[in-house]
Amino acid sequence: MQSLSLNSSSLQTPAMALVLVRPETETTGASTSSRALQEVVVKLAEELMRNGQLDDSSPLGKLLAKSMAADGKAGGGIEDVIAALDKLIHEKLGDNFGASADNASGTGQQDLMTQVLSGLAKSMLDDLLTKQDGGSSFSEDDMPMLSKIAQFMDDNPAQFPKPDSGSWVNELKEDNFLDGDKTAAFRSALDIIGQQLGNQQSDAGGLAGTGGGLGTPSSFSNNSSVTGDPLIGANTGPGDSGNSSSEAGQLIGEFIDRGLQSVLAGGGLGTPVNTPQTGTAANGGQSAQDLDQLLGGLLLKGLEATLKDAGQTATDVQSSAAQIATLLVSTLLQGTRNQAAA
């Protein structure tokens, strides 16, 4: 991610003299922005300007343009952009966001920039999908962020099985509608990435993890398992249907089969417990006991292998989500930066 330098010299710009306090309004009163946050706001506003006007080619530029239009400030200059961005940050991240940042300098101010961008990216995830009958829709304007979410899903097929279009990236190209199942999968991905953005925001602020995200954002959360995890799906409680027994039997069979595969691959079953044989009559019981022990060992081995794979999958998914979260933060200003470099 391209960093935004926040050294003191770079922040001493003509725009700094324009808006150091958020304008008072009938509803909010005086600004709660700290001076450190005001400096970050000015720097971001300058990044979003092109030829004296707001450049709405980036995701953050689009969001800010919509906000300014709603307030009757469309087409405004740097003063209006700074004021609108300051207002947007407080709306999305809280009235007291950045209130204690005045003592920060150098790296601390750069961390505040990271907090702002991570927080805004996280808040924007909420608005990527619009609920509709039978599923959800999305806007072409949000494709820079949506495509990165879809790529994350394609990179983790165990967690997000391919849709009928062949890939989640292709799914976004077919039309702007996702059915119920695809919406659930997409929201699961949003939850996981939202958690990573929250972690980045907290880490930059030197805070303990806030958790939360956009719901229960964990790759194995209560409602984010889109792969039908057999450990969760095979419910055998009294409220289940008549198929519970057969499902439980199938689950046990799968564990035993997995355990057998592990043994054949060199896993072993450990050292069996030998029971003295006391004659032919006891041999039948001994054989049954040996079989029970064998099946029990295979079952345990299969369970261990399944849990190990699940743990590795969770680690891989979270690592991938962290990378996508960083890309999303960079994407907020990407349109503006690409044009500036051209």
UniProtKB/Swiss-Prot annotation:
Primary gene name: hrpZ
Subunit comment: Homomultimeric.
Organism: Pseudomonas syringae pv. aptata
Sequence repeats: 211-217, 266-272, 277-280, 312-315
Function: Harpins are proteins able to elicit hypersensitive response (HR) in non-host plants and are required for pathogenicity in host plants. HrpZ forms ion-conducting pores permeable for cations. Such pore-forming activity may allow nutrient release and/or delivery of virulence factors during bacterial colonization of host plants.
Composition skew (Polar residues), residue ranges: 217-227, 272-283
Location in the cell: Secreted; Host cell membrane
A Pfam entry, by short name: Harpin
Protein name per the record: Harpin HrpZ
Region called Disordered, residue ranges: 200-248, 267-287
Keyword Secreted carried by entry: yes
